[in-house]
Amino acid sequence: MKTPILFVVVVAVLIVTDSAEGFKGKANSFLKPLQRRGLEEECCQETCSYHEIWENCKKLCSDELHKMFVEICQPPTEKVPERD
């Protein structure tokens, strides 16, 4: 009688553990782009004032962020070049 109960408990633990790992993976895959986007936005916003920094940081910006910041951020002396 103990064997079927033990089997059920082991299977239940495996299912719960697998579900938790799946949830953790989904949470991480959802959070990583948000964290990266936050860094990109911060970097791009900083570049509004400094053209040299823009040149270095625009490589980190996603295409959509780059388009948005090209419209918003114009260096004091020259136009921000289009992304390659």
UniProtKB/Swiss-Prot annotation:
Residues 23-37 form a propeptide. SUPFAM superfamilies: Insulin-like (SSF56994). Residues 1-22 form the signal peptide. The keyword Ribonucleoprotein does not apply. Disulfide bonds join 43-48, 44-73, 57-61. It is found in: Secreted. It comes from the Eukaryota. Keywords: Carbohydrate metabolism, Disulfide bond, Glucose metabolism, Hormone, Secreted, Signal. Belongs to the insulin family. Insulin decreases blood glucose concentration. May have evolved to activate insulin receptors (INSR) in vertebrates. Molecular docking studies reveals unique interaction with the human insulin receptor. In vivo, insulin-like peptide injection reduces blood glucose levels in two models of zebrafish diabetes (streptozotocin- and glucose-induced). Also shorter swimming distance of zebrafish larvae, an effect which is not observed with human insulin. This is Insulin-like peptide 05.
